[in-house]
């Protein structure tokens, strides 16, 4: 900038030395104005350069970081920084000789319903939705020693609840005369996991006074080291179709010998 100013001053002195153009010599003020304008342009260019550099820096950072979209559902935290999501619907539970996935919003309960019960969790808002684990001694070497899955169910039918009323009655809802409870085996299967045989049973039970339209009860059973392990998870029929199915099925099918 100093060199440019010197150039204008040099031209000014040259004009003064010419006698023919003495009257046309202009005031040195325009030189000062020109210098000021050049200073303003330099400052403006510097500001633009800074803004451009900052824009390029931000753009490069955005391209370099692979940020996932914040695809949060209602009631969930947005995935703003693109971190991998974790399954927060279930929590791992490691018991004495067994393990399973427990619904995260279910609470432990001290209520004991069945022989050998060592664990019980239930829904915070509806205790009908719950799971239990029972461990009892057995002389069987494998779950298959109980017979077929259907035969095994007949030996542990106490898990489904028994009819307490045996008087004469005719209940609505398709019940037989004198019956106030019924059950239907929806599915029975077996599988080998880790060298152990497992039975899986899905049962729908109904009672004449039930306000849930029945209960879906899922049972997983196996034998290990002289012990019969049973996991039963259940939910009322209405809640089953409103989202409880996922929690009951996952809890029952995740059960295994540790």
From Swiss-Prot:
Subcellular location: Plastid, Chloroplast thylakoid membrane
InterPro entries for the chain: Mog1/PsbP_a/b/a-sand, PsbP_C
Keyword Thylakoid attached: yes
GO cellular component: chloroplast thylakoid membrane; extrinsic component of membrane; photosystem II oxygen evolving complex
Keyword match Endoplasmic reticulum: no
Induction annotation: By light.
GO biological process: photosynthesis
Transit peptide: 1-73
GO molecular function list: calcium ion binding
Keywords: Chloroplast, Membrane, Photosynthesis, Photosystem II, Plastid, Thylakoid, Transit peptide
Entry's family note: Belongs to the PsbP family.
Job description of the protein: May be involved in the regulation of photosystem II.
Protein name: Oxygen-evolving enhancer protein 2, chloroplastic
Provenance organism: Solanum lycopersicum
Gene this protein is translated from: PSBP
